Each structure stands twice: as structure tokens, then as C-alpha cells.
């Protein structure tokens, strides 16, 4: 009986871990989609739909090595606090900012 309970417990744990992996995998895709949607609605007007910036506005090219070499903390700080003419997005949660940084990283050349 005790051996059966151990096997049942191990199977339950394995099922829970598998379910958690599946849930987090789909969540990550949703977060990427959410970050892309936020980029399109809040950022693309100045940074361009492709993230390459707009020369007339002197906005940075997110695909450039100069932007891509910045640390996640630096990019997060600019998103959260703004810089120059860029407004601060203080209402974004830390997870949303992290997802936006990941999206910006995906734009590299």
C-alpha cells in the first residue's frame, strides 16, 4: 500500500510539472503577443513599425548594435522613466517591461 502511494505521488508530481510547463509555454507566447501589440499601439508611432526609428524624430533604431548592446536594466529604465521626448510608462508592470525588452531584443538585425 505504501509503495502504491509513493508511485501515485510521483505520478501526480510528474503530471503537475508537465501541466505547469505547458501553461508557462503558452503564457510566454501570449506575453510576446501582448508586448508586440503594446509596441504597435504605443511605440511604433515614433520608433516605426519595424523598430528602426524615424530620422525626422531622431528616435533610436532598435535594430542597431548601439541599442542592442544596452543592458536590460538600461532599456527597462528608459521604458519606465522615459528619456528626452519619450514619455515614461510607469503604469507598465515589471513583467510587461521585461516582455517589451524581450520584444526589442527580437528586432535586432
Residue ranges and their predicted role:
Residues 1-33, 109:
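N-terminal export/targeting leaders of redox proteins
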Residues 2-15, 47, 69-74, 89-106:
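Periplasmic c-type cytochrome electron-transfer domains
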Residues 21, 26, 66, 88-91:
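Short N-terminal micro-motifs specific to bacterial/archaeal maturation
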Residues 21-22, 37, 60, 101:
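Short non-domain terminal segments
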Residues 32-60, 77, 83-90, 106-109:
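Periplasmic/extracellular electron-transfer cofactor-ligation site
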Residues 54, 66-69:
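Short, flexible, glycine-rich and Lys/Arg-enriched loop motifs at helix boundaries
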Residues 62-64:
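PAS-family sensory/regulatory domains
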Amino acid at each position: 500500500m505504501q509503495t502504491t502511494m509513493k508511485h501515485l505521488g510521483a505520478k501526480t508530481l510528474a503530471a503537475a510539472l508537465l501541466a505547469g510547463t505547458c501553461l508557462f509555454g503558452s503564457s510566454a507566447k501570449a506575453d510576446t503577443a501582448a508586448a508586440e501589440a503594446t509596441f504597435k499601439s504605443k511605440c511604433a508611432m515614433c520608433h516605426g513599425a519595424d523598430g528602426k526609428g524615424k530620422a525626422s524624430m531622431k528616435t533610436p533604431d532598435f535594430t542597431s548594435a548601439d541599442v542592442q548592446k544596452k543592458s536590460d536594466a538600461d532599456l527597462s529604465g528608459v521604458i519606465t522613466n522615459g528619456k528626452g521626448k519619450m514619455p515614461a510608462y510607469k503604469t507598465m508592470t515589471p513583467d510587461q517591461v521585461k516582455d517589451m525588452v524581450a520584444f526589442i531584443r527580437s528586432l535586432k538585425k
